[in-house]
Amino acid sequence: MKKGKILIVAAHPDDEILGCGGTILKLKEKNDINVIFMTNGVSARGKNKISEKRRKNACLKLFRYLDIPKPEFFNFPDNQLDKTPLLKIIKKIEKKINLYKPDTIFTHYSNCLNIDHRKTFEAVNTACRPINKISVKKILSFEIPSSTDWALFHGKNFQPNYYVDISKFLNEKINL
């Protein structure tokens, strides 16, 4: 992958590491990387503000370790992106794209079991439609096996057609 600006759009904190953590480790040396999270990842589990703060602090600590800019949290309700107007989600993503001007976006696979993953994919693809001059040249999906492997009735299984060799970073990714 050529040097450029990468935007990772993930539904929840930790999706970016599970889905493309090794790729982040490899590409951060020669690329600018920004990450946005659509939700806090805890509110649907009946967790309280302490759990949310703990998860956010762990996320920020990881980003300091990775030496990439702090992520942006959009704070939509967890596991409820299907109840949020799609246009509202799209406009937040479009604003980030217009400010950051990424060349490449990594996001969820379209047929994940998790509704937030599917809606994130849909919003990213809609935000990148070619109606205006847009910076995004490539949209790549990542897999989160716990979500894609259980999506039996949501269409095709994840079938990657783009690979990043992360063999030099595999042990570090596992330890993230």
Language-model segments: what does each one mean?
Residues 1-9, 26-29, 47-53, 61-65, ...:
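Metal-dependent de-N-acetylase/amidase catalytic core
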Residues 8-17:
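Short, glycine-rich nucleotide/cofactor-binding loops
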Residues 11, 38-40, 144:
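Cofactor-binding loop segments of dinucleotide-utilizing enzymes, especially the Rossmann-like FAD-
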Residues 17-18, 115:
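Short N-terminal helix/helix-N-cap motif within the alpha/beta-hydrolase-1
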Residues 18-36:
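Histidine-anchored nucleotide/phosphate-binding helix
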Residues 37-38, 73-77:
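Short glycine-rich catalytic loops that host catalytic nucleophiles or stabilize transition states
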